[in-house]
Amino acid sequence: MLSPAKCESEEAQAPLDLHSSSRSEPECLSLVLWCPNPEEAAPSSTRELIKLPDNGEMSLRRSTTLNCNSPEENGGEGRVSQRKSSRGKSQPLLMLTNGCQLRRSPRFRALHANFDNVCSVPVTKGGVSQRKFSRGKSQPLLTLTNGCQLRRSPRFRAVDGNFDSVCSVPVTGKFGSRKRKSNSALDKKESSDSEGLTFKDIAVIAKSLEMEIISECQYKNNVAEGRSRLQDPAKRKVDSDTLLYSSINSSKQSLGSNKRMRRSQRFMKGTENEGEENLGKSKGKGMSLASCSFRRSTRLSGTVETGNTETLNRRKDCGPALCGAEQVRGTERLVQISKKDHCCEAMKKCEGDGLVSSKQELLVFPSGCIKKTVNGCRDRTLGKPRSSGLNTDDIHTSSLKISKNDTSNGLTMTTALVEQDAMESLLQGKTSACGAADKGKTREMHVNSTVIYLSDSDEPSSIEYLNGDNLTQVESGSALSSGGNEGIVSLDLNNPTKSTKRKGKRVTRTAVQEQNKRSICFFIGEPLSCEEAQERWRWRYELKERKSKSRGQQSEDDEDKIVANVECHYSQAKVDGHTFSLGDFAYIKGEEEETHVGQIVEFFKTTDGESYFRVQWFYRATDTIMERQATNHDKRRLFYSTVMNDNPVDCLISKVTVLQVSPRVGLKPNSIKSDYYFDMEYCVEYSTFQTLRNPKTSENKLECCADVVPTESTESILKKKSFSGELPVLDLYSGCGGMSTGLSLGAKISGVDVVTKWAVDQNTAACKSLKLNHPNTQVRNDAAGDFLQLLKEWDKLCKRYVFNNDQRTDTLRSVNSTKETSGSSSSSDDDSDSEEYEVEKLVDICFGDHDKTGKNGLKFKVHWKGYRSDEDTWELAEELSNCQDAIREFVTSGFKSKILPLPGRVGVICGGPPCQGISGYNRHRNVDSPLNDERNQQIIVFMDIVEYLKPSYVLMENVVDILRMDKGSLGRYALSRLVNMRYQARLGIMTAGCYGLSQFRSRVFMWGAVPNKNLPPFPLPTHDVIVRYGLPLEFERNVVAYAEGQPRKLEKALVLKDAISDLPHVSNDEDREKLPYESLPKTDFQRYIRSTKRDLTGSAIDNCNKRTMLLHDHRPFHINEDDYARVCQIPKRKGANFRDLPGLIVRNNTVCRDPSMEPVILPSGKPLVPGYVFTFQQGKSKRPFARLWWDETVPTVLTVPTCHSQALLHPEQDRVLTIRESARLQGFPDYFQFCGTIKERYCQIGNAVAVSVSRALGYSLGMAFRGLARDEHLIKLPQNFSHSTYPQLQETIPH
C-alpha cells in the first residue's frame, strides 16, 4: 500500500507483521504505479504524476498494520466514490488531502481509520474521478498527497466497506464496496490480473513445453533424498532453438486475445508494496518509474524477503541497464552471484533447455545474457552481448522473444524493463511464460535485446560489453570488471550439490560436490560391452528392469541409495586431469573441507546422460564409533567397510595409495610405503571391528606390504597361541567369581575347558569366596594397579632365573651362614646374643604394602626356619639380595605352577573394572569428564593389563552408564584402546532377564580377540523379558536382540515366583548357615539351580548328590526392631509400600503427613513413618518399604540389603530377601557358597556378573575358539540352554 508522503519516521520503522491476518486463499498482489494521459485525467485530479522523492519521504510499503488517523481526528471527512474497474465492478476509493487517490486493497485493513500506523495525514474531502487506463478501461484510483495514484487490483475483494478488515474508515456511496462471496478454487482459477496468467494459461504453456522440450532437458530434484546432484542434460541431435521458438509461439497463440494474463503465485513471486525508489527515466516521456520490492513465496523457498530502502537503492544503482526476463523452462541449477559496485544482486547463472541447449550455460547480467558452450574439458566460446536502446513506450509487462536471426547458431533474446519480479521468476527456476497483452493482441517488445553468437573457436575469450565491462576468466572462476579494472566481482558459477543423509546414529559416508569449483569430468574410451557389463553388474540391470529405487529390501535408514536408470558402463574416467580406473582408491569430496577415502567399484552413465561412480567406503578411526577417543590412533590407518553408494563422478579428487597389511597384535607399521593401510573391517552393527580375511571388493587391487608381513605364518602363530586342553583365564576385579564361573560352565557345554587360573580382587571376603569355590585358582588379594607392577617384576625374574641359562649360579648364603666361619666354634657365649634368622623358603610374592608398613615395592613372603607359618613376614626384595638361591627356587617353582601369568600365555582376560564415579546411585558423579575421576581410573588399568599380557581373548563388563555419561566417552575409550592394540572388538548390551533370570539388569559387554582368532559373537536371548527402563538411544544398535521380523522362539519371562517359591520359610531372625530343602523344585529354573557341581561342570571330582545337598545362606539381613515393626505394618499384597502406613495422605503423587491425625509412635519413641521417606525423591518414590510380588521381575540385585530406598521385602514374609534368594536372582547355583559377613555376602552377590549371562557368553567363547562361530555378530543358543545341565545339553551340541 502506498503511504502518504508526510510519515512519522519512528512509526515508519515499525516492524512488519506478515502473518497478522489469515486468508483462505493464496495471495498474489499485483500493484502498478502509473501516470495516466493528461487528456484522460478527471477534473478532480489533473496534476501530473510527480517524481517520487528519493529522500525517503514517501515509502512504498506493504504492511498489515498500516493505518492513518481518522477523519474525525484530523478534521477531514473521507469520501469514497464509485469507480468502474476493468471488470465493470464498482470499487471504492479514498482521496487524500492533496487530491491524490489511493486504491483500497482488501488485503490490508486500516485500524480506526488510520493508514498503516505510520501516517498522520488527514483524509480530506474530495471526490474520486474516473481515470482511463491506456487499455481503455476504467479503473478506480486513490490520490495521495503528492498527486501519485495507485490502481486497485480487482483480484482482492473489499471487506464490509472497511480498509482491509482493520479499518474503521466509512465507505460511502450508493453501492459501497462489493464483497466476493465465492472462495472456491474455480473462482480463483478463472481470476486474472492485467499483469498475470490464469491457471489455465499456465497449464497450456506447461503442457506445450513439456511435450516439446522435456526430451531435451529433464529437471530433477533429489533434495528429498538428501542429495542434490548436478545434472547435465542429455545431448541429443535436436534443434533446440526450433523447439524453443515453436514452444513460445504456440504458448502465445494459446492465450485468448481478450484475456489478460495473470501471474500465479504458484509460479511467480508475489509483489510486495513496500518502499519506493526512482529507478530511472523513460526516454519517451521522461517520467519516473517506481518499483516495488518483492517477496519470495513461501511455497518456493520458505523465506520472505521484505523490501526496504537499501534494496531499492541497490536496484537504482543498476539504472536503465536492469532488465527482466521470463524463462520458458525451469532452471536446473541456480547459484547466487555476489553484488559489487554496479552489478545487480539478482545476477545468477541459469542452465536449462529453455534458454540454452545441452552442454551450455546461460550467464545473466544487468545488460543481457551470454550463452557458454562446454565441450569436453574446456570452454568452447563465450559470446558478446549487444545492447540496443531502451524504449519504454507502452510498457506494461515484460515479454520474451527467442527467434532465429541471420547469424548461424544465433539466438536473440528480448527482454523488457518494467518489473523485477520477471527476473526473479527467471532466477527461481519456475516454468512460466509471459506475453504483453494490450487491447486484445500480443505485443512484441524490442527494448533490450541480447544476441548470442556461438563460435567454433577453441580459445576461451573474454566478454566485452558495449559499456566497456569485460568478463574475464580468473583462477577462482569468472569475474565481471569495469573498464578501469575496478570493482571486480567474483562469479560463483557452480551449484552446491551434496548428498547427505543420516538417520539414527549410523556412521555413513556421502560424497559432496564442491561449491566453488566445477570439476571437468568425462569417461575415457568406449563403453564396456553389454555382455561384460551385465555379467559384472547384473544386479543393477535387473534393478533397472524392475524400475526399483533400492536394491533388495532396504530399510528406511539404508544409505545405499542406488541409481537404477543405468545406460552403459565404463572402465575409466578423467576428472580435473586425473585418470581413475576401476579398483582405484581415491580421495572423495566431503562436507566442508573434509575428504573421504574410498575404492571405485563401478563407472556408469545413466539414461539421462549423468555420470556416476560407485564407491566402497573406507573409514578413518575418528569416523567410527570411537570418535574423539581415537584421535591418538595412527592417522594412516583405515577400516574396510561394506558400505557402498552411488555418487556423481565429479566428486572424485585424486588417486591415493592404500595397502592391506597382515593383522598382528602390537603391529608398528612404520615402514609401510603408502598413503594409507588397513587390516580390519568396521561394521556399525554392535560396533564391530573384525579381521578382514577375504576382501569383497569387486575390483580387487589390494596389495600387501612386504615390510610388515610377519615372518611366521598365521597358522604357525595360531598353533603357538593354542592352548592344549584348556584355555586359562585371568579374572580381574573378580569379586566372588560370577563372570569366570559362568564362562567355565558355558564353555564346557561347547566342548572347551575354560579354567580360571588367576583371579585378582581387592576385597578380602570376595577372594575367600572365590577360593572356596575354585580351589585351584591363584587368587590374589591385590589392587589391579599393584598387580600390573607385580606382573612386570615377575617377568623380569622369570627372564633372569628361568629363561637365561647363562646366568651364573650364585651360592645361597643365608644371614647366619654368612656369619659362620671356620673359627665359629671358638666364639664366646656372648655371640648368642646376636642371633640371626635363617630363611627357610619363600612362599609368596607381592607388590605394594600388604603388611601396612608404609614401604611399597616388590616383596617376598618369607618362612623363617624354626617358626610357624603364621609368623611368616613380608620382606622387600632388595633386603634379600643375598638369598639368590631361595629366590631362584621360588621363581622356578612358581613358573612351573603358573602362579602368575606371563605376556602371551593368557587365554582370556575377563573382568568388570569398577566405575563408582559413574554409577547411577552416585549422586556426586562427574558426568562431564568421567575419565578425570579417580574412581573411574580402573578402566584404564584394565586396558593396561590387557596391553601388557596380550591375551587371546578379552571380555570386559560394566554398567550401562559408561555409554550414557559424557556421550559414552568411557565406553568409546575402552573400545578405542582395544582397536589401537590391533584387537578385534565388539560391543553389546545384554539383559539378565533374557537368559532365564527373573531380574531386569542390563550390562555392557565388550569382546576382544587377537587378529588370528575368531571374534566371539553375542548369544541371542532365550527368554522374553519385562522391560523396566530404557537403554541409551545412541547405542540402540548394540542391544543384543533379535532383529525385527526375524523368526524367534522365546520362552516365557521368568518372575519372582519361578525363582524362589520352593525355598523354606524363614524369619527375620534366621541365622542358620545351612538348611535342608523342605519341598521339591516346582519349576525348570528351580530344578536347574539345585543341580550339583558335577551336573553343571561334568567334573567327576565332586561326589555330592542332590539328596545330601543342603541349602546354604538362606538367611536374611537382620533389620532393626523399628524397621521390623514398620515392615509388619506393610500389607501383604501387590504394590504395597510405606504409603499404606497410617497417618499419611498423598497429594499430586507426593506423600505428606495427615494433619488431622496424630503420628503413630513406635516403642522406641520414633514415629512409625520415618522422616526420610518424605525427603527421598521429594516424597514421590514408592520404593521405601515396598514389597515385591510373585508375578514381578526384580529391577536389579543391589549390594546393600536395605528396605529404606528399595523394593526388597518378601511378598508374604516380614523380612528382606535372603542371601540365597538374591543369589538365585543372579543365577548362582545353590552349591555356590559365600564367605564373609552377611553384609559382605550381599555385596559380593550384588557386584557379581549374573552367572546365567556369563554362561551364555562362555558358550559363545567356546564356539569361537573352536572355529564354529565365524563372522556372525550373534549366535543362537541350544534349545533349553538356560535351564539345562551339561549332560542334558550334550546331545544337542556339535562336537
Curated annotation (Swiss-Prot):
Keywords: Chromatin regulator, DNA-binding, Methyltransferase, Nucleus, S-adenosyl-L-methionine, Transcription, Transcription regulation, Transferase. Gene3D superfamilies: 2.30.30.490, DNA Methylase, subunit A, domain 2, Vaccinia Virus protein VP39. Pfam families: BAH (PF01426), Chromo (PF00385), DNA_methylase (PF00145). It catalyses: a 2'-deoxycytidine in DNA + S-adenosyl-L-methionine = a 5-methyl-2'-deoxycytidine in DNA + S-adenosyl-L-homocysteine + H(+). The keyword Methyltransferase applies. It comes from the Eukaryota. Residues 837-902 form the Chromo domain. One of its GO terms (cellular component) is nucleus. The keyword Acetylation does not apply. It is an enzyme of class 2 (transferase). Residues 1-23, 61-91, 249-287, 814-835 are annotated as: Disordered. Residues 578-693 form the BAH domain. Transmembrane segments: none annotated. PROSITE patterns: BAH (PS51038), CHROMO_2 (PS50013), SAM_MT_C5 (PS51679). GO terms for molecular function: chromatin binding; DNA (cytosine-5-)-methyltransferase activity; DNA binding; SUMO binding. GO terms for biological process: cellular response to heat; DNA methylation-dependent constitutive heterochromatin formation; methylation. Residues 727-1268 form the SAM-dependent MTase C5-type domain. Residues 61-72 have a biased composition (Polar residues). It is found in: Nucleus. The active site is at residue 915. Its EC number is 2.1.1.37. SMART domains: BAH, CHROMO. May be involved in the CpXpG methylation and in gene silencing. This is DNA (cytosine-5)-methyltransferase CMT2. The lineage of its organism: Eukaryota, Viridiplantae, Streptophyta, Embryophyta, Tracheophyta.
